[in-house]
Amino acid sequence: MKKFDVCIVGGAGHIGLPLGLLLKSKNKRVVLYDKNTNTINKINSGIMPFLEKGGKKLLNHNRKNIFATNDIKYVKNVKIVIVCIGTPITKNLKPNFKYFFKLFKELKNHLNHNQVIIIRSSIYPGSCE
């Protein structure tokens, strides 16, 4: 398995992919973990899945330093995990943490105490305690 510096969970989305491209441009080896196989295939083929100014150029420059996958085992072998997921709201405008907690249930066996975990989401302070 190829070594990466950073794993971006939700990495094929409108927040995760541009962040991954920026990190790649700073010579970080980035793995993008996502569940959208269609978007993963586009990224790995050098196709930007959405409009992002300068995105196509960044994606195709030094492509060996970025890889998109739906294989969760890549999370385990990185120093930094950045979680980029949205937080939907209920009809009462309160955060709905259902998907957030579901994601971390899936991730928990693939995280370790030596990793830096960054939550890049619209959750409020104290949500992760």
Q: Where are the regions a protein language model picked out?
A:
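N-terminal Rossmann-fold NAD(P) dinucleotide-binding loop
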Residues: 16-17
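Glycine-rich Rossmann-fold phosphate-binding loop(s) that bind the pyrophosphate
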Residues: 11-12
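Gly/Ala-rich phosphate-binding loop of Rossmann-like dinucleotide-binding domains
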Residues: 20, 24-25
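Rossmann-like NAD(P)(H) cofactor-binding subdomain of soluble oxidoreductases
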Residues: 89-129
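Conserved N-terminal Rossmann-fold NAD(P) cofactor-binding segment
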Residues: 3, 29, 35-80, 86-94
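Short, flexible coil/linker segments at domain boundaries that flank nucleotide/cofactor-interacting
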Residues: 1-2, 112
